[in-house]
Amino acid sequence: MARNSIKKSPVVKKKDTPIVRKRKPIQQEAEEDSNDEESEDELNVEGLIDASDDEDEEEEQEQEEQPQEEENNSDDDDDDDDDDDDNNSEADSEEELNQLLGEEEEEDPSDYNSDEFSDEPKDDDLSRINIKSLSVSDPSIQKNSISKFSDGSIRILKPEIEPKYDSDDSDAENFNTIGNIPISAYDEMPHIGYDINGKRIMRPAKGSALDQLLESIDLPEGWTGLLDQNTGTSLKLTDEELELIRKIQQQENTDENINPYEPLIDWFTKDEEIMPVTAVPEPKRRFVPSKHEAKRVMKIVKAIREGRIIPPNKVKQQLTEEEEEDQFNFDLWQDEIEISDHIMNLRAPKLPPPTNEESYNPPEEYLLTEEEKSKWLQESPIDRERNFLPQKYNSLRQVPGYQDSVRERFERSLDLYLAPRVRHNKLNIDPDSLIPDLPSPKDLRPFPIRCSTIYEGHTGKIRTISIDPQGLWLATGSDDGSVRIWEILTGRQVYKIQLINKEINNEDHIECLEWNPDSSCGILAVCVGENIYLIVPPIFGFDIENSGKLRIESGWGYDTFGNKKKDLKISSQKEEDNKESDNEDEDEEEDNDDDDDDDEPETSSTVEPKKEVAKWYPPNTEQASMGISAIIQCRKTIKKLSWHRKGDYFVTVSPDSKNTAVLIHQISKHLSQSPFKKSKGIIMDAKFHPFKPQLFVASQRQIKIYDLAQQVLLKKLMPGVRLLSTIDIHPRGDNLIAGSYDKRVLWHDLDLSATPYKTLRYHEKAVRSIKFHKGNLPLFASASDDGNIHIFHGTVYDDLMTNPLLVPLKKLNGHKIINQIGILDLIWHPKEPWLFSAGADGTARLWTT
């Protein structure tokens, strides 16, 4: 059948595929042989194949089965023929071959010039067939392209070589090129790095726990159990490394280039030789004394006789004689020879040189009088400032012997061997390096530098001053019992009220006064002894004065002490005493007034209303005509007063009032309450936070910060002083300054520790007042009994990592010191860099730029 196809086929053109047609019968014959062999062992697989296969696959199988059946039939027919038929077919094939050769010779030679036999390459189907492998090439493969250079010459552009397929090192191992980056950086990624071409090296698949167990049981050759950090796979040893380990275990030579069995060269023989190498007899000169040595000996003997050479025994004798002579021959006035001490040797301290009073003829001012002599003799020897009496003699020969010389030498000897010695190394420190690098005060202007106005009129010392929120009126309170209001710019007195009659009451003083921070009401609170006067001075005009009086008068309707608001104490008096004894050592706690309202009365032995900590009284006709709108009476003398920023609350401090030392008063309801059940220590000052619901309470040695909303203790500051005098809070609320009676100014950073950030010691006496500027200027000042005011620049940065900057600017003095009391109070102008001070000399001063 194959032969017939060859005979009938015409001349093959390039568009046909004759090669595939010729190979197809060969494949069919191979398939026929395989089918004959497999027919005997054929299995029945019906029912095992899924009936839902595609129809295309069934058609392909049917087409493949049809030629196979035809070939099988033809093969069966051929098998039935006889040997004679085979011989006839061979003869026929030879005749057909001869006919084909003849037809090829008769072909027209012009056919060789046709397109079929042209040498020019054409883009046809056969051009893509590899003759050796009979495979079709990929049309996407790029070939060389011809271009031209700028000069017109031919330029051949070759396709790019793909390193993965075309280069010779395609079988090289893909090394990871991530460098020193740890492989843990790729834990959350699907790849473990990049190869030399920048392509990702994917993470090898990890088997299950069962696979890992099987791998640990069947250990392959070179297994280490380690993980390769570059590839992420298990690290295996190479054959060379395994061979090296084997040689080390068997103590073999690891380097093949070294020969352990090199030939040994015996440089010395082991046999003892009897006969000498040379048998020359000894010369006579070795047995006769040398003439040359005799000459040298005679020269040495001659030099010894002449004294040019000294024998060793005489040298020692001469040295001893010279030392004996030099022992008493020395220069008395030559410099002292310094001998270096041992490293562990500490020299004895030298005696101090004598002073003028130890002279035998001292000046007259060094001699003691009779009273000083008697006082010196009465004192014990330990308490005496000097251990001798200065005496005067006309000449040195009249000076007697010092009777205490032996005793002093003995005491010094005791001190030298009994007292321990310490070597103190001197520190070579530049003094300029200890001074902090601060900006110049000229760059930090403006700040007050001079006194521009003096407010005179008080007959006693001015204890307190305050300026209204608008910065126009200055109020002063003095020991003469009067409160005066001054116009700041002119120094003119515009209002005066006499609150204390000194003829009747000499004990009370005006301790403090302060304007309400709300400028629309014009209320001035004045503390006189146990009373607080709320005054609206007639200096503002009708609108402001009427607003202030209405705000105070509206609170009389809310005064319900003893009627509506009661605190019902359920426990008996005996239980209350026990509770107070148990809480004696606890810190201060705030009283929760809201919880008291919710408590319902219960049947008990004692039901008492809440005690009044202060009483509110309306003024009489005479007091109302003076501008007084309300009077608050407390239990003890009030020393400090501070307003809340909204102007409805103010806090007062009575140091002698024990558990009611701190009181909070509310104008709108005429209520006074004590926030603490008891106080530990004497309360010196109290202030509200500038914008948070917090209360700062300063006792004698510590400062506590309370949260009024949550009623808890937030922080406790430990200034480390004996007696605090006053505190003030920075307008931002993150810093606090405190003054003490032991001459210290303390700066606390509330974001840091409880100890002070800076402790300033520049005052000579007690610090009475210290204040921050409430405007936008970073200034603060402190006043003391030494009569001086110190102005400081204090910048607080927004960056929490930067510490505040404190720079001293100016020292102001002008007040006189009366009875060791200097300046009592300070206040800053709310807008300008002006400072007001009140002194014990009865004057108030304005310090301006």
Curated annotation (Swiss-Prot):
Compartments (UniProt record): Nucleus, Nucleolus; Nucleus, Nucleoplasm
Domain of life: Eukaryota
GO CC, alphabetical: nucleoplasm; PeBoW complex; preribosome, large subunit precursor
Composition-biased stretches (Basic and acidic residues): 569-581
GO terms for biological process, alphabetical: maturation of 5.8S rRNA from tricistronic rRNA transcript (SSU-rRNA, 5.8S rRNA, LSU-rRNA); maturation of LSU-rRNA from tricistronic rRNA transcript (SSU-rRNA, 5.8S rRNA, LSU-rRNA)
Keywords: Nucleus, Repeat, Ribosome biogenesis, rRNA processing, WD repeat
Gene Ontology molecular function terms on file: large ribosomal subunit rRNA binding; ribonucleoprotein complex binding
Quaternary structure note: Component of the NOP7 complex, composed of ERB1, NOP7 and YTM1. The complex is held together by ERB1, which interacts with NOP7 via its N-terminal domain and with YTM1 via a high-affinity interaction between the seven-bladed beta-propeller domains of the 2 proteins. The NOP7 complex associates with the 66S pre-ribosome.
Function noted in UniProt: Component of the NOP7 complex, which is required for maturation of the 25S and 5.8S ribosomal RNAs and formation of the 60S ribosome.
Record-given protein name: Ribosome biogenesis protein ERB1
Organism: Candida albicans (strain SC5314 / ATCC MYA-2876)
Gene symbol of the encoding locus: ERB1
